[in-house]
């Protein structure tokens, strides 16, 4: 078992959702925190909540898609705390898309730059410090869509499958080199976060046309799928970290889908299409939104 008390933990995407819940859960367990997010307002709110518990906390506005910025941040955290034990690469975006054939390259680039490259940037920047701690742990947040593909989610699924592959490779390399760094990949199912609504808001800011069907589909997806409270998701993740698990499934939906994918690899795509079509029928079924 791993003890989190007195560990220095870095959490990206800490402004809301799972990231905020992780920050508060880590604070409850006695960690010292370095929190980052591109959303300065939400990040400040999280910092206030954490500080109210008496926890030592440092925060920074951070765009994880910017490699130089992330490398600078890693140095700042190490200089401030003197050591870094845990890294939670949680920052991510949904990125509303259509079919792969119809999705613009800019959508692929935007989603991959945050969801995949953000994880690579964070891991590469902090890994030397984690090794130096003698008791390091990398925790990368993938998704249910890191082992189950969904039509209409090409960029998102690509990014989350990539996080899974990268993390599993890193785990093997740390074991091969006998490095003091544990590596965990997390697959959340439907967590009640703001990721779907945020994707709509970001699309509006970019001037994209938002149809009523798309708005209704997002609302229905939130209602049908995004049910697990982020606080519960964070507790599952932190319990898994404490138990040194290399793979953490968050929610019954993630566990069931994982089982279906492994037992029915040839049939799960058809099952996925049928289930989503039935559940999302009232709002249209051209595309769906990510699970977590």
Regions found by a protein language model. Name each.
Residues 176-252:
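SDR active-site lid
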Residues 123, 159:
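Active-site helix of classical SDR
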Residues 143:
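Residue(s) in the substrate-gating loop at a strand-loop-helix junction
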Residues 53-56, 76-89, 96:
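A glycine-rich helix->loop->beta "capping" turn
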Residues 40-41, 61-72, 105:
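The beta1-alpha1 cofactor-binding region of Rossmann-like NAD(H)/NADP(H)-dependent oxidoreductases
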Residues 98-100, 104-109:
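Substrate-binding pocket helix/loop in short-chain dehydrogenase/reductase
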Residues 2-33:
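Canonical Rossmann dinucleotide-binding motif of NAD(H)/NADP(H)-dependent dehydrogenases/reductases
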């Amino acid at each position: 078992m791993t003890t989190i008390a007195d560990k220095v933990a870095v959490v990206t995407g800490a402004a809301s959702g799972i990231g905020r819940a992780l920050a508060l859960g880590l604070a409850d367990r006695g960690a010292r925190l370095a929190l980052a997010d591109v959303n300065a307002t939400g990040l400040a709110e999280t910092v206030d909540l954490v500080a109210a518990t008496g926890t030592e906390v440092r925060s920074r506005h951070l765009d994880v898609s910017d490699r130089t910025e992330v490398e600078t941040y890693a140095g700042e955290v190490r200089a401030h705390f003197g050591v870094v034990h845990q890294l939670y690469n949680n920052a991510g975006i949904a990125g509303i898309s259509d079919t792969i054939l119809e999705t613009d390259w800019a959508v692929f680039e935007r989603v991959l730059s945050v969801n995949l490259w953000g994880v690579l940037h964070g891991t590469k920047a902090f890994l030397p410090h984690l090794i130096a701690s003698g008791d390091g742990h990398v925790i990368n947040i993938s998704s249910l869509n890191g082992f189950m593909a969904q039509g209409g989610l090409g960029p998102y699924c690509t990014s989350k499958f990539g996080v899974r592959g990268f993390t599993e490779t890193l785990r093997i390399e740390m074991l091969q080199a006998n490095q003091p760094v544990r590596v965990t990949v997390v697959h959340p199912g439907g967590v009640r976060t703001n990721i779907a609504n945020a994707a709509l808001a970001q699309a509006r800011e970019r001037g994209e046309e938002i149809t009523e069907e798309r708005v209704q589909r997002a609302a229905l997806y939130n209602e049908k799928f995004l049910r697990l409270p982020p606080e519960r998701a964070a507790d599952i993740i932190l319990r898994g970290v404490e138990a040194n698990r290399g793979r953490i499934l968050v929610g019954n939906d993630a566990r069931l889908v994982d089982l279906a994918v492994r037992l029915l690899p040839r049939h799960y795509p058809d099952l996925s299409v049928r289930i989503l079509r039935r559940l999302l029928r009232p709002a249209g079924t051209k595309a769906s939104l990510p699970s977590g």
